[in-house]
């Protein structure tokens, strides 16, 4: 019994650390690329992090408890993006900001996959193999058009500003909707073929 509990504890710790390394670097990388794209490609003044969000986030602000739990038990999940100041980030800027979340996850997938491929440490391999797999999962999940995922903000970026308030109100109900899909096992059934595809792509990169 103690062996089983130790194994569960180790897997839970590995999953939690993996979640941290796919979520926190993703958001900081997103902000870096966002500022870079504004200053280089759009020739616009770069926005500071505290100007993008209504409230300056801390590292734990990106952790979504439900997203963490689903990653641990169902092999897919999501992160929490603090509320954006839609008065400053809208239209073209919102599209870029949302798309860069997906791109950041793909970059982390490539980085973590390369690390796990080159390392000789079994623990480092497990950590970054799972990090690569979950980063690719995050990039795909983010494209779902469900608030507050990036896919919904990509659509929102094409809508007039008057719909932004509606979006914020709808986000809460959409979270309840996602919980319902998980409880009814609909979301896991939808994700199952995607998880198999993601595992195959990850294995192709690493092995």
Residue ranges, per PLM feature:
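Hydrophobic transmembrane alpha-helices and their immediate loop junctions
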Residues: 1-207
